[in-house]
């Protein structure tokens, strides 16, 4: 199951880019650094071409992010996306994913939004923006809803990733704290994230 793979990998790299070539460079740096789950956002021009290119990559678990409507979800799934992430909950996206039997991670902030997403059949939600609430918010949510799987995006860094997991997240989305500097910098940061993740799992 894709959900289990995301949890096992622990880290989802949120990849943005001004062009396919730029995004591809970031992806390769992440893969070299050991991060296998890659969320390619719709802010990348012609992102579906890139999804198609990497959908059968042996090491990569490719998903799509910044999905705002059903057509975007459908096009990305058609290209080979294994999971779909959106900044907020979308009924349209939910229906497409349910129909195509593809994992959907809707963005949620409040407990009411999380309950709505779960009522619609979703097991994992994206807590976004994560840095608004911080890691302790996850523990507070999981007290009354222990079975919800949470992936925070925004505010997760090498320095605080262990705090997020200590408070009960299932995996984390990392973007700007990973995708910065040179490609070598990104690869080294990815390695640092993976090293920290290995310690958390141990």
Protein language model regions, located:
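Histidine/lysine/aspartate-rich catalytic loop segments that bind and position anionic ligands
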Residues: 87-123, 127-131
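Glycine-rich phosphate-binding active-site loops on the catalytic face of alpha/beta enzymes
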Residues: 83, 87-93, 127-135, 167-189
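Conserved N-terminal beta1-alpha1 strand-loop-helix module at the mouth
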Residues: 1-82, 99, 147, 158-159, ...
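Aromatic/hydrophobic pocket-lining residues that form π-stacking "cages" and hydrophobic walls in ligand
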Residues: 26, 93, 97, 113, ...
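Glycine-rich beta-to-alpha transition loops that act as phosphate-gripper elements at the mouths
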Residues: 16-19, 64-70, 86-90, 106-111, ...
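Conserved beta-strand positions in the central sheet of alpha/beta enzyme cores
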Residues: 39, 63, 85, 105-106, ...
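Catalytic cores of alpha/beta
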Residues: 69-79, 112-120, 137, 156-172
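Conserved functional loop/turn residues at catalytic and ligand-binding sites
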Residues: 34, 58, 80, 88, ...
């Amino acid at each position: 199951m894709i959900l289990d793979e995301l949890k096992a990998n622990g880290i989802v790299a949120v990849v943005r880019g001004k062009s396919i070539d730029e995004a591809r460079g970031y992806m390769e740096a992440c893969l070299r650094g050991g991060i296998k789950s890659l969320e390619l956002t719709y802010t990348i021009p012609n992102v579906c071409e890139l999804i198609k290119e990497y959908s059968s990559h042996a090491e990569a678990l490719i998903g799509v992010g910044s999905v705002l409507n059903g057509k975007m979800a459908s096009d990305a799934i058609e290209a080979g996306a294994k999971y779909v992430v959106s900044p907020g909950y979308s009924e349209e996206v939910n229906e497409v994913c349910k129909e195509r039997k593809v994992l959907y991670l809707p963005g949620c902030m409040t407990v009411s939004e999380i309950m709505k997403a779960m009522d619609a059949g979703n097991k994992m939600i994206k807590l976004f923006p994560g840095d608004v609430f911080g890691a302790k918010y996850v523990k507070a949510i999981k007290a009354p809803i222990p079975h919800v799987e949470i992936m925070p995006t925004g505010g997760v860094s090498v320095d605080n990733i262990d705090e997020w997991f200590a408070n009960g997240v299932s995996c984390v989305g990392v973007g700007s704290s990973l995708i910065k500097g040179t490609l070598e910098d990104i690869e080294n940061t990815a390695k640092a994230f993976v090293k920290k993740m290995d310690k958390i799992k141990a």
